[in-house]
């Protein structure tokens, strides 16, 4: 029988064997079964050795002796050649890893034995110190004398100051009875056995951790030496582990059974050793399943590297672990802050001006005149002259009424007067100067002045109003003209110049 077959034969649960042996098949997860406790512990015995038999077993002594033997030897990486399962030390590592589980069960049995025996002396201590090892150390320290709770330095190394104060107050009012010397001796024996088993468990952990760095260095870096040894033992060796897909590696060590009478709500389906490893448990609960899938995928790669004895220094393992931690940090990052978009620039279109000097003058110029106001005004209760629509057109209102007795005169309003721009005024002024024209701007004459005159003799006579001015201008052009120049005249005979 090969070593892999022996490891498979050592598995306790047949369901785990099926799970470890099926790689590509996806079979439906069976319902959680109720199993009865196989052995009913008889705690009425006088000695703890009658119920806790692991300490005196031959298997425990052989494994611990081999562990001490291999610890004394210096491990060498070059000794690990070929399949890891063929290494002589590999079997010891797997057995030692399985032994830690049995030690945990044995410690629970001893704790229950001590609790039942010591409840005669101090029944309240069980509720004050819930931890099993702390309870065992406290019982060994107190013994039959509960006054040791006060000012005890050894007890301060076991319990916190607040717990010590509560224990001392409760011990002063307890209704417990004194233990006999024989009962106290049996309790001390049970306490010593529990503490020695706990020390052996830590010794096994140190050994497995030191040796897993040579057998599977990359896998140990990712999930730790203890978890790596557990999944290797369940899978049947490193070679079988390297052949398994990540979805099956994640389920190795899944608890699919529970004791009868206990609730199954706390049992997490599809969770194994990887889910309960430190690297996954360090995350919030809502990310642990996702993290377990990621770690299982990286463990598959690391196991394949270790099975071929590559990257013995763990370089690949450190790279995979860094990648896992980066993804963990990315998952736990807070969501990005929503970018506040600025408001778009408003459309500066032409807006209606509602004030200002220019606007007020424009309203005066384009506003309603008095005539238009009179035309728009109507009297209440009076019949209009055009009420029967005899004339086509708009009604004239008050403007069309007769007999008002007032003479309408055109009101000259500076605001409504026609305006000429300054540029046009300068242009007209230049034209009047050049062409000698006359205008109301140049001369203060009436704008109705005309060259047509009415005389009693001839009737209608056309008169040039500029004739007099023209005569004066012609006279001045001879001698007093501003345009006169010197003229050079050559004489016919003498050749003299005259002006």
From Swiss-Prot:
Question: Keyword RNA-binding on this protein?
Answer: yes
- UniProt modified residues of type N6-acetyllysine: 438
In this chain's numbering, which residues are marked as the site (Interaction with U4 snRNA)? 247
For the site labelled Interaction with U4atac snRNA, the residues are 289
Biased composition, Acidic residues: where in the chain? 7-40
User: Where does this polypeptide localize?
Assistant: Nucleus; Nucleus speckle; Nucleus, Cajal body
**Xref: SUPFAM superfamilies:** Nop domain
GO CC list:
Cajal body; MLL1 complex; nuclear speck; nucleus; U2-type precatalytic spliceosome; U4 snRNP; U4/U6 x U5 tri-snRNP complex; U4atac snRNP
Q: Does the keyword Coiled coil apply?
A: yes
According to its UniProt record, which protein family does this protein belong to?
Belongs to the PRP31 family.
Q: What is this protein called?
A: U4/U6 small nuclear ribonucleoprotein Prp31
């Amino acid at each position: 029988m090969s070593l892999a077959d022996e490891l498979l034969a050592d598995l306790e649960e047949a369901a785990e064997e099926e799970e470890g042996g099926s790689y590509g098949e996806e079979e439906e997860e069976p319902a959680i079964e109720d199993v009865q406790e196989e052995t009913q512990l008889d705690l009425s015995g006088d000695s703890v050795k009658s119920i806790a038999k692991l300490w005196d077993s031959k298997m425990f002594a052989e494994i611990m002796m081999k562990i001490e033997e291999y610890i004394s030897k210096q491990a060498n990486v070059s000794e690990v050649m070929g399949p890891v399962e063929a290494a002589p030390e590999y079997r010891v590592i797997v057995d030692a890893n399985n032994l830690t589980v049995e030690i945990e069960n044995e410690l629970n049995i001893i704790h229950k034995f001590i609790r039942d025996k010591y409840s005669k002396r101090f029944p309240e201590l069980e509720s004050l110190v819930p931890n099993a090892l702390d309870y065992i150390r406290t019982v060994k320290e107190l013994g039959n004398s509960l006054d040791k709770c006060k000012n005890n330095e050894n007890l301060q190394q076991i319990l916190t100051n607040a717990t010590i104060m509560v224990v001392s107050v409760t011990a002063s009012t307890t209704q417990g009875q004194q233990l006999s010397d024989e009962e106290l001796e049996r309790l001390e024996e049970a306490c010593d056995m529990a503490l020695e088993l706990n020390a052996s468990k830590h010794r096994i952990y140190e050994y497995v951790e030191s040796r897993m760095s040579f057998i599977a260095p990359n896998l140990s870096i990712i999930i730790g030496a203890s978890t790596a040894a557990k999944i290797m033992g369940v899978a049947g060796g490193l070679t079988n582990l390297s052949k398994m897909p990540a979805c099956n590696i994640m389920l190795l060590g899944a608890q699919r059974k529970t004791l009868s009478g206990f609730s199954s709500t706390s049992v997490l389906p599809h969770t194994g050793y990887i889910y309960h490893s430190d690297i996954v448990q360090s995350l919030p609960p809502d990310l642990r399943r996702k993290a377990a899938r990621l770690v299982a995928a990286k463990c598959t790669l690391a196991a394949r590297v270790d099975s071929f004895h590559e990257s013995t220094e763990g370089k690949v393992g450190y790279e995979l672990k860094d990648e896992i931690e980066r993804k963990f940090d990315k998952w736990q990052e807070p969501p990005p802050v929503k970018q506040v978009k600025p408001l778009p620039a408003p459309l500066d279109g032409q807006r209606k001006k509602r004030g200002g000097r220019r606007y007020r003058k424009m309203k005066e110029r384009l506003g309603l005149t008095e005539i238009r106001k009179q035309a728009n005004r109507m009297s209440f209760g009076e019949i209009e002259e055009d009420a029967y629509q005899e004339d086509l057109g708009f009604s004239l209102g008050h403007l069309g009424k007769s007999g008002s007795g007032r003479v309408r005169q055109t009101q000259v309003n500076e605001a409504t007067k026609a305006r000429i721009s300054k540029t046009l005024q300068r242009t007209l002024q230049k034209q009047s100067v050049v062409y000698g024209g006359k205008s109301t701007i140049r001369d203060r004459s009436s704008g109705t002045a005309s060259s047509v005159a009415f005389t009693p003799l001839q009737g209608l006579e056309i008169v040039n109003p500029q004739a007099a001015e023209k005569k004066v201008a012609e006279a001045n052009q001879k001698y007093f003209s501003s345009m006169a120049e010197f003229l050079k005249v050559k004489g016919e005979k003498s050749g003299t110049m005259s002006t």
